[in-house]
UniProtKB/Swiss-Prot annotation:
The lineage of its organism: Archaea, Methanobacteriati, Methanobacteriota, Stenosarchaea group, Halobacteria. GO terms for biological process: RNA catabolic process. This is Ribonuclease J. Its cofactor is Zn(2+). Disulfide bonds: none annotated. The gene is rnj.
Length: 448
């Protein structure tokens, strides 16, 4: 059976992920993502109103024209998790393919939200929920399997396409967390089984984000302990404390809510994405928030919440807000500009439970946001976070578990892939033979 890989997006940058695997006449697409940095450089861009061709020209979503080079039918579109760099282009591209969108339950709920907010295209693909550990047939001879992984969002999976020639494992995105906060540990046992079943692993497509960092990525439990230590250290402060983190990071938001209660403050979730992600997780029973937890996304309701905080005393509340990357219209940035009823005063504490996404736009916007906050006298507590991506030792462990015949590095530009290439070469792989360094828009024929 012919096996061909199309590297459509995410092979020259961190963002707009999209990969297609052809096994005979059957094709599975993994991810359809957005490159947020290409959107953020433009003022007041509303992607939901834009045409896909304009977004492709901007470099914001994958250019999927290479799909015309693949001879076969798309059987499934499979987002690995709910981050926008993996699902943000589904509302723009999925309607081109007569195939269901298959994902974990939380991911599919987020995809549904993306589709409902789309104003340019009608997306009528079936939405199919499949739990980690589940399988579905792809054509007559292949099978799709979901393996549970841990990442900085709940319900992340690594999909595996089992073919007669061996398994193709799509390894984006994960960290090797054996002590997570809300979920089960990563299913390394299943990865080891896949590496030793049948024909083994034909190809492993891997996220290289942190491949150049030594050691292993700490557990979310480590970030939780750090966060508790910081909040406990400021528990006696009688002014404002504000926290910000990734809205999609339900485990971190849950910890912030819990620790706010422990230091005698009422947590409030503020911002559209904060309300969307946490509200979805709560409705699905994936997180247990206090019954009285307020979530406010619309501008007027947010302002009413801030007025209540100011009237009843900032010392009684912990607003948990959007804006950890310094996004211009996010809540924390607006607070820094003085555009909300919340007054930041000298000595108030701002807790960033997030790292800066390593893109120039994000770095610049985060710097500007911090400077605005400091100008008002705020004290910044930074980088209370652990990454959602494997470091060097995690990559060694995955290679040992899967023992793949071929490797394709992804989720970086060529410079960012170099550390992974060096790591792979130390394990006996060779560029041009079984280590495939590639770019967007290419195809790789693994089996002819």
């Amino acid at each position: 059976m012919e096996i061909e890989i199309a590297t459509i997006g995410g092979y020259e940058e961190v963002g707009r992920q999209m990969t297609a695997v052809r096994a005979g006449d059957d094709i599975v697409i993994f991810d359809m993502g957005l490159n947020l940095s290409k959107v953020l450089v433009h003022d007041n861009v509303e992607t939901e109103k834009m045409h896909s061709l304009d977004l492709i020209d901007m470099g914001a979503i994958p250019d999927d024209r290479v799909m015309s080079d693949l001879e076969g039918d798309v059987k499934a579109i499979v987002p690995t998790h709910g981050h926008l760099d993996h699902i943000g282009a589904i509302s723009k591209l999925a309607h081109r393919y007569d195939a269901p969108i298959v994902g974990s339950p939380f991911t599919i709920e987020l995809v549904k939200g993306e589709i409902e907010s789309e104003q340019k295209f009608g997306v009528e693909n079936d939405l199919v929920k499949m739990e980690a550990g589940g399988t579905m047939e792809i054509g007559d001879r292949c099978e799709l399997e979901f393996v549970h992984v841990t990442h900085s969002i709940i319900d992340a999976i690594n999909p595996v396409l089992h073919t007669p020639e061996g398994a193709v494992v799509y390894g984006l995105d994960k960290r090797m967390d054996h002590d997570p906060v809300l979920e089960d540990p990563i299913d390394m046992e299943r990865f080891r089984e896949i590496g030793r079943e049948g024909e083994g692993v034909l190809c492993y497509i891997e996220d290289c984000t942190n491949a150049g960092k030594k050691g292993r990525t700490p557990s979310e439990s480590t970030a939780r302990r750090h966060l508790k230590d910081v909040l406990t250290s400021v528990a006696d402060y009688d002014g404002g404390i504000v926290a910000t983190t990734f809205s999609s990071h339900i485990s971190r938001v849950s910890s912030l809510v819990e620790f706010a209660k422990e230091i005698g403050r009422e947590p409030i979730l503020l911002g559209r994405s904060m309300e969307r992600y946490s509200g979805t997780a709560e409705r699905m029973g994936r997180v247990n928030f206090p019954d009285d937890l307020g979530m406010f996304g619309h501008r007027k309701s947010v302002d009413r919440a801030f007025k209540r905080v100011m009237n009843e005393g900032k010392e009684n509340f912990l607003p948990i807000v959007t804006g950890h990357q310094g996004e211009p219209q996010a809540m924390l940035t607006r607070m820094g500009r003085g555009e909300t009823p919340y007054d930041i005063e000298d000595g108030d504490k701002i807790i960033f439970s997030a790292s800066v996404i390593p893109e120039p736009t994000n770095k610049g916007q985060r710097y500007q946001s911090e400077q605005l906050l400091r100008m008002q006298g705020a004290r910044i507590y930074d980088d209370i976070h652990v990454s959602g991506h494997l470091r060097e030792e995690g990559h060694y462990q995955m290679l040992d578990a899967l023992q793949p015949q071929h490797l394709i590095p992804a989720h970086q530009d060529m410079k960012g892939m170099a550390p992974y290439a060096k790591l792979a070469k130390s394990q006996g792989y060779k560029i041009g033979r079984d280590l495939h360094m590639t770019e967007n828009g290419n195809t790789i024929q693994l089996v002819e």
